[in-house]
From Swiss-Prot:
GO terms for cellular component: sulfite reductase complex (NADPH). Keywords: 4Fe-4S, Amino-acid biosynthesis, Cysteine biosynthesis, Heme, Iron, Iron-sulfur, Metal-binding, NADP, Oxidoreductase. Coiled coil: none annotated. It is an enzyme of class 1 (oxidoreductase). Its cofactor is siroheme; [4Fe-4S] cluster. Siroheme binds at residue 474. It holds the Pfam family NIR_SIR_ferr. [4Fe-4S] cluster binds at residues 425, 431, 470, 474. This is Sulfite reductase [NADPH] hemoprotein beta-component. It comes from the Bacteria. Its EC number is 1.8.1.2.
């Protein structure tokens, strides 16, 4: 019998279900159906290798079940020792690779069921956990990865960690199932003051941004905190609500949305406002139709003013007026940069966030060698790249030698700025929702675009490119200047017109087309951009498309862009 997600949550005994029995079943590599939902809250998804699914079916074998495990690493900061431990886990239990996500977490792929518990224990031994990395709860909290402003970053990171801890599910299930914590009387009846019996209607995402950099794409988050800095001092945060990327092809009842800025709070009000926002979504969100369950639809269905008033009522105070701020871009800066405290930070471009040893670069081995130096820290960026941070000036040469030896700067040396900054979700072969390739197709598509960019003198012009294997939008494609959203194998929707700041949604330009048609559609647009763009303002491709009337805002019924006058 198939149970609804809401029923599974409410009867799970605080996320326990029958997970222990599923894990102990030697007959199958899969979990029981209800437990496949519950394990998400513990930080894992059951998947199978879709490349060999048909062959296994012909052989009358069950699918090649495996598990993806995602870490909870608020702000994406870990120590060299933790890096080495995670590297060892990837080599021993997973598919010999690590993957940096767009939310600054790690993903391990290819873990089999009988090694799932040992893998979880190994991760926790590093003082990193996976609780609430997935599921209808608050997910990993993003933080701006700006390495220049060390003091401001430290404050943002600390605040994000506070919010992350505060919004964790209150259950011992995780520790009982994975870490063999002794069960006590009343297990399964813990008080859950924030989430209640049914948790949230859908996933919930929070990001902390530090203007002028919007690397977290804060307006794609359900709840955003935009740091207001004056002369290096953090005054507090502007609050934004209602962002979200997911949609369904051809369904006018679903759409991506850019968040609204609703006011300003001080640092000591963070937990109260976060709790108020989350519980408002808990109680008012749509639990009957999951595709309409995200917070963005709650806002659109009830009205922004109604939701803001409810948030203020629950918080016990009124929001102050939003403070002026401005974003310049949402990308990363590659290579070495000097921090405000005199140390140095090296940003490496990692295509689609994949860390593995390949024919072109030995990222897994090379980063292991750097971690063994035990200096600084590793910071994952929301653009799936990596910052080796806090390097003393006298040790830069040692890092440079390892970078050259292992080819770690292969991404930094990509022939186009577009390729250096592109993002893609995992998609095939492991994601069950993927309709087309994304991560595996990104290098080929970037290479196919290269001649067009070079022909028009745009090779070193930053253009935001993102690929997604399905319309759920894990790579935040709807904010990109150019996006491919998978429709079927080898076919994509071409979306155009986002901007470099993460403030405007793009628009469907061509539907369900192949690579040749995509390139043919882009050629005349890139030619006009090269010839007619405003070079005095460094006009972006998406901005040019709108100024020239070549594209309009998308026809979604609600918030499609952030009004620039709010940023004055």
């Amino acid at each position: 019998m198939t149970h609804s997600v809401e029923d599974i949550k409410s009867t799970s005994r605080r996320l326990r279900g029958s997970l222990e029995q599923s894990l102990a079943d030697p007959v199958t590599g899969a979990l029981r159906e209800d437990d496949q939902t519950l394990i998400k809250y513990h930080g894992s998804y059951q998947q199978d290798d879709r490349d060999i699914r048909d062959e296994r079916r012909r052989q009358k074998l069950e699918p090649a079940y495996q598990f993806m495990i995602r870490t909870r690493t608020p702000g994406g900061v870990i120590s060299p020792s933790q890096w080495l431990a995670l590297d060892g886990i990837a080599t021993r239990y997973a598919n010999h690779s690590l993957r940096i996500t767009t939310r600054q977490a790690f993903q391990f792929h290819g873990v089999i069921k009988r090694e799932l518990k040992a893998t979880m224990q190994a991760i926790n031994a590093t003082l990193i956990d996976t609780l609430a990395a997935c599921g209808d709860v608050n997910r990993n909290v993003q933080v701006a990865a700006n390495p220049l402003r060390s003091q401001a970053h430290a404050t943002l990171y600390a605040d994000a960690a506070r919010v992350s801890e505060h919004l964790l599910p209150n259950t011992r299930a995780y520790y009982e199932i994975w870490l063999d914590e002794e069960r006590v009387s009343g297990s399964g009846a813990e008080d859950e003051p924030i989430y209640g019996d049914r948790y949230l209607p859908r996933k919930f995402k929070i990001g902390f941004a530090a203007p002028p950099h919007n690397d977290v794409d804060v307006f794609a988050n359900d709840l955003g905190f935009i740091a207001i800095l004056r002369e290096g001092q953090l005054l507090g945060y502007n609050v934004s609500i209602g962002g979200g990327m997911g949609a369904s092809h051809g369904d006018a009842e679903t759409w991506p949305r850019v968040a609204n800025v609703i006011g300003f709070v001080t640092g000591d009000q963070l937990l109260d406002i976060a709790t108020a926002v989350v519980t408002t979504q808990r109680d008012l969100g749509n639990r009957a139709v999951r595709k309409r369950a995200r917070f963005k639809y709650t806002i659109d269905d009830h009205g922004l003013d109604t939701i803001v008033a409810e948030i203020e009522r629950r918080a016990g105070f009124s929001l102050q007026p939003a403070q002026p701020f401005a974003f310049a871009h949402n990308g990363d800066r590659y290579g070495w940069v000097e921090g405000e405290q005199g140390d140095w930070h090296l940003t490496l471009s990692l295509p689609a966030g994949r860390i593995a040893d390949t024919d072109t670069a030995a990222h897994l081995s090379g980063l292991r060698a750097i971690a063994q130096l035990q200096m600084g820290e590793f910071r994952m960026t929301p653009n799936q790249n990596l910052v080796i941070a806090g390097v003393p000036a006298e040790q830069r040469a040692q890092i440079d030698q390892l970078v050259a030896q292992y080819g770690l700067d292969a991404g930094n040396l990509a022939p186009t700025a577009l390729a250096r900054g592109a993002m893609a979700c995992v998609a095939l072969p492991t994601c069950g929702l993927a309709m087309a390739e994304a991560e595996r197709y990104l290098p080929d598509f970037s290479a196919a675009l290269q001649p067009l960019l070079e022909r028009h003198g745009l090779a070193q012009t930053p253009i935001v490119l993102r690929l997604s294997g399905c319309p759920n939008g894990c790579s935040r494609p709807y904010l990109a200047e150019i996006a491919l959203v998978g429709k079927a194998p080898g076919r994509y929707n071409l979306m155009l017109g986002g901007d470099r700041r993460g403030q405007r949604l793009n628009t469907l330009y061509r539907e369900n087309i192949n690579e040749a048609d995509i390139l043919a559609a882009l050629e005349p647009l890139l030619a006009r951009y090269a010839a007619e763009r405003d070079r005095h303002t460094d006009e972006g491709f998406g901005d040019f498309l709108h100024r020239s009337g070549l594209i309009a805002l998308p026809p979604y019924p609600t918030h499609r862009h952030l009004d620039l006058e709010l940023l004055a």
